[in-house]
Amino acid sequence: MAGALKATIADSRGMNVLLILNDGPYGTERSYNGLRLALSLAKTTDTSVRVFLMADAVACAKTGQTTPEGYYNIGRMLKGLTSKGIEIGTCGSCMDARGYSDADLDAGICRSSMAQLAAWTLEADKVVTF
């Protein structure tokens, strides 16, 4: 089984992957699991990863998140991705609807748009939605 997994990962090099997150940072683990996948994909050679936050997932990009000790921190996970050069966009309309401004976003995360999501989707070899 492990050999098959390694072969699959080796075959996926050179791919462009877009992850779209929809759920808020805490409550369900969908965004958490999407970011876990993004971090794992970021470790593979020649794989380009982008993350787009929309709907309640725009709250994942909120600066200054504090969680109890031992609990996962979505903000830290996003910082781990941006430190690797991974592009993270947030739906501007979704931000506006929830009262978020650009100043609310962690460093390296940018307000984006449906036009940007459309472009990223067309450039992606695979799109995964959480």
Language-model features: where?
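Short, active-site-adjacent cap segments at secondary-structure transitions
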Residues: 58-61, 96-98
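C-terminal structural segments of small proteins and small subunits
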Residues: 97-130
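Short, Lys/Arg-enriched N-terminal segments with co-localized hydrophobic residues
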Residues: 2-14
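A glycine-rich helix N-cap at a beta->alpha junction
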Residues: 67-94
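Short, glycine-rich nucleotide/cofactor-binding loops
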Residues: 18-32, 61-66
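Short glycine-enriched, charge-decorated loop/helix-capping segments at active-site entrances
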Residues: 64-69, 105-107
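Histidine-anchored nucleotide/phosphate-binding helix
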Residues: 31-44, 51
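Short internal beta-strands
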Residues: 38, 48-55, 88-92
